[in-house]
Regions:
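Conserved, well-structured interaction surfaces
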Residues: 35-44, 49, 54-55, 72-138, ...
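Membrane-proximal, proline-rich intrinsically disordered regions
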Residues: 21-62, 324, 328-331, 338, ...
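Flexible, polar/acidic helix-loop-strand segments at domain edges
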Residues: 281, 336-411, 606-610
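Short coil/turn linking the two alpha-helices of tandem helical-hairpin repeats
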Residues: 135-137, 142, 205-217, 424-427
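Short coil/linker segments at helix-helix boundaries
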Residues: 140-163, 212-238
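Bacterial Sec-dependent N-terminal signal peptides
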Residues: 2-5, 13-41, 170, 203, ...
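Long, intrinsically disordered, low-complexity segments
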Residues: 21-23, 92-95, 169-171, 249, ...
Length: 610
C-alpha cells in the first residue's frame, strides 16, 4: 500500500505521545527517549510523524479554493470578517514542538553522525515549512528552536522577531537539509522528501519573500518599518534563482512529456489523474489508495450538493494563448462574442486539460467514453468546469473514491520560480526563457509566439495588452509573461493565494467580474459542446419539461446575488455569478494575532490594521 509508511508514522506518533499539544508540555521519560533515539529505525519512525502536517488526501486536490479566478457559491475565508482577533485559530505550535523535541534529543552516539544528521535535515526541512506557513499567515512571529518544559520559561513571553530573523532561520534550515539529507534519488511515489525537496522549497520561500519586500515596500505592511535590512528583495531573488538552478542542473527531474493530447487528456493532465505519481516531474506528493477511499476530487468538483461549485472565470480563461502562441481574443472582427466551442479550439492544450473543453469525454456507466459538456445544474457557475484533478470515470463521483495521487511540488514550479526570479532581476536570457517558459509552452502544444508573448526560444520585448491590463502596475513584458505562465501551469495547485499576497495583488480577487461562457440564446435548447446533442436550456420565463437536457433558470441582468445571472452582449449572453462582499482591505494580507494569545503574552504586537 503506497501510504503505509506515513500511516505507520502517524500511529507511532499518536501511541507514544511525541506530538505534543502545548509549547510547555511535560517532558518525556528518559527511557522512552532512549528507546526512540538509540537506533536508526526509531529516528525513521519518528520522522514519519512530521508528514502529518501535510494536506490531507481529502483536501489536497482543492487547496486552491480561495483564489481570484475561482468562481464559487461562497466566499469562505476570503471575505472581510472571515478572521478576526477573536476568531483566528491557526496560532498553533504543537507541530514545532514535535520537531524541536526531535532535534534536541537526536544526540545518541549509538547512531552514526551521518545518519543523525540525515534525520535532523528532514526535521529542519519541516521546521522551515512550519515557519514559512507562519510567516505567510502572520508575518513576523517569535523564533523558537527549543522545547519548553517549564511554564515559567521567560522565552515563552518573547515578542515577535523580525522578518529578517525568521527568513534567515528558514534559509539556514533548508540549507542544512539540502546538505545533510542523504536521499538524492526519486522516492517511491514521491511521498518522502529528498534533498531536492529542500532546494525546491528554498526557491519557493525566497521567491515569496523577495516579492513581498518588493511589492509591499510602500504600504502599511512595509518590512522596512520592522527593522529588516539584512535581506533585500534583490538578494532574495538571487537566492531563489540559485536554489532553483541547483535542482535544474543537478536534480533527477524533468518535465513529463510523451502522452499525446486527446479528448481532454494528455501529458499535462497525467500529472493529476494518475494512480501512481508521475515521479519524473512530481517532486513531492500525497498518495491515495482507492481501497481506503481517501481522495474526493470527483465528489468535490462534480457534485451538486458537496463543495462550493468552484469553476474558472472568463477573464482568466482568456489568458490562455492560442496554439500558435498569439494572444486569444474572445470576439470576432464584428465585435460579437465567440461560442464556447470556439473558445476551446486551437488553444494552449492546458485549457482543455484544466476544464471541460468542447472535445471532453467521460467514461459512462457502460464503460464507453462519451462527449460530456459542462454540467450547469448546480455543478458549474460559469461553464468552465474543472477536470484537472478529476477522474474521467463517473464511478468516482459519489464519495471519497479517488485513487489518483496528488502533487504538492513539481519540477514545473522550479522552472517557473527560476524564470520569475531572473525576470525580476532583469537577467533572464533567451536561453533561460527557452529552458523554462519555452519548455512548458512546448509541452502545452504551443508552436510559436509574438514579440509581445515571446516565442518558444525568445523572451518578449513588449507588453501584451491583455496580460498587462490583467496585472496593472507591472510593465516589464518578461515578468508579465512569466506570471501568465505561472497562473496557467500551476492553476489549482494551492499556490495562487500566496502569489497574490506576495505581489500585493489580492484586488484581482475583488475585481474579477466572475463572468462565464457565452450562452447564444435563451429559452431554446442549446448544444454547448458542439457534439450534435442538446445539453442545456437556459430560461428566464418557464422551464421546459424535456428531460434529455438540463433546464437552468437565469436572471437577465447583473444585479442578483447568489443566482445565475446572464449579461446581454453582442452575440448572446454571458453567464455571470455575483456574490456580495468581495473586499480586500490592506490589513487582510496578514492574519491578526489572536487576542487571547496577546492576553497571555502582552509582549506580542498586533498586526497593522487589527
Amino acid at each position: 500500500m503506497k501510504n503505509r509508511y506515513i500511516i505507520l508514522g502517524a500511529l507511532f506518533a499518536l501511541s507514544t505521545g511525541f506530538t505534543a499539544c502545548d509549547m510547555d508540555e511535560e517532558p518525556q521519560s528518559s527511557a522512552s527517549v532512549d528507546m526512540v533515539f538509540s537506533a536508526e529505525k526509531g529516528l525513521q519512525t519518528y520522522a514519519y510523524s512530521f508528514y502529518n502536517v501535510l494536506p490531507s488526501r481529502a483536501s489536497a486536490s482543492h487547496r486552491s479554493e480561495t483564489l481570484d479566478y475561482g468562481v464559487k457559491n461562497t466566499l469562505s475565508g476570503m471575505e472581510v470578517g472571515a478572521y478576526t482577533v477573536n476568531s483566528a485559530t491557526s496560532w498553533s505550535w504543537s507541530d514545532l514542538r514535535n520537531i524541536n523535541f526531535f532535534l534536541e534529543n537526536n544526540t545518541n552516539e549509538k547512531v552514526s553522525e551521518s545518519i543523525r544528521n540525515n534525520y535532523n535535515g528532514i526535521a529542519r526541512l519541516f521546521r522551515a515549512r512550519f515557519y514559512f506557513d507562519k510567516l505567510v499567515t502572520y508575518g513576523p512571529v517569535p523564533w523558537i528552536d527549543k522545547v519548553f518544559n517549564d511554564a515559567e520559561d521567560p522565552d515563552l513571553y518573547n515578542s515577535q522577531d523580525t522578518r529578517d530573523v525568521i527568513i534567515g532561520h528558514i534559509i539556514d534550515d533548508l540549507d542544512y537539509a539540502y546538505q545533510h539529507i542523504t536521499q538524492s534519488d526519486v522516492t517511491l511515489n514521491s511521498t518522502i522528501v529528498n534533498k531536492w525537496t529542500a532546494a525546491a522549497f528554498k526557491s519557493r520561500v525566497c521567491l515569496f519573500e523577495a516579492a513581498w519586500r518588493k511589492y509591499h515596500a510602500n504600504d502599511e505592511l512595509d518590512v522596512a518599518r520592522t527593522g529588516c535590512s539584512q535581506y533585500s528583495a534583490e538578494q532574495l531573488y538571487q537566492l531563489a534563482a540559485a536554489a532553483a538552478r541547483e535542482v535544474m542542473d543537478k536534480g533527477p527531474y524533468k518535465l513529463h512529456t510523451g502522452t499525446p493530447y486527446s479528448e481532454g487528456r494528455g501529458a499535462y493532465r497525467d500529472l493529476f489523474i494518475s494512480d501512481n505519481t508521475v515521479t519524473t516531474e512530481v517532486m513531492f506528493a500525497v498518495a491515495t489508495d482507492k481501497t481506503l477511499g481517501m481522495g474526493q476530487a470527483n465528489w468535490w468538483y462534480n457534485s451538486s450538493t458537496y463543495g462550493p461549485h468552484l469553476c474558472m472565470s472568463r477573464k482568466f480563461m482568456n489568458t490562455y494563448l492560442n496554439i500558435d502562441g498569439t494572444p486569444y481574443s474572445d470576439k470576432h472582427a464584428d465585435g460579437s462574442y465567440k461560442t464556447f466551442v470556439e473558445d476551446c479550439t486551437d488553444r494552449d492544450l492546458r485549457f482543455n486539460q484544466t476544464v471541460r473543453g468542447a472535445d471532453y469525454t467521460r467514461k459512462d456507466a457502460s464503460g464507453a467514453y462519451v462527449p460530456t459538456a459542462a454540467n450547469f445544474t448546480g455543478h458549474t457557475l460559469t461553464g468552465y468546469q474543472f477536470t484537472k484533478w478529476v477522474m474521467d470515470d463517473v464511478a468516482y463521483d459519489d464519495g471519497e473514491n479517488n485513487d489518483n495521487d496528488e502533487p504538492l511540488m513539481r519540477y514545473a514550479e522550479v522552472l517557473l520560480n527560476y524564470a520569475e526570479a531572473q525576470a525580476e532581476l532583469g537577467k533572464l536570457t533567451d536561453a533561460e526563457w527557452a529552458e523554462t517558459i519555452g519548455a512548458l509552452r512546448a509541452r502545452a502544444g504551443i508552436t510559436g509566439g509574438t514579440a509581445q508573448t515571446g516565442t518558444l526560444t525568445t523572451k518578449p520585448t513588449a507588453a501584451e495588452p491583455y496580460i498587462a491590463a490583467y496585472y496593472p502596475g507591472v510593465s516589464n513584458p518578461v515578468v508579465l509573461e512569466v506570471r501568465r505562465e505561472r497562473e496557467i501551469e500551476l492553476a489549482l495547485e494551492g499556490l495562487r493565494l500566496n502569489d497574490l499576497k506576495r505581489w500585493n495583488a489580492c484586488d484581482l480577487w475583488v475585481n474579477d467580474p466572475w463572468q462565464g461562457v457565452l450562452i447564444p440564446a435563451l429559452n431554446t435548447p442549446l448544444d454547448m459542446n458542439g457534439d450534435g446533442t442538446y445539453d442545456a436550456y437556459f430560461y428566464d420565463t418557464d422551464a421546459i419539461g424535456d428531460e434529455t437536457y438540463a433546464s437552468i433558470g437565469v436572471y437577465v441582468g447583473t444585479g442578483k446575488n447568489n443566482v445565475l445571472n446572464v449579461e446581454k452582449v453582442n452575440g448572446g449572453y454571458l453567464m455571470k455569478y455575483n456574490y456580495a462582499g468581495r473586499q480586500w482591505p490592506q490589513r487582510q494580507y496578514l492574519y491578526p494575532v489572536p487576542e487571547v494569545v496577546i492576553q497571555f503574552n502582552p509582549n506580542l504586537k498586533q498586526n497593522p490594521g487589527w
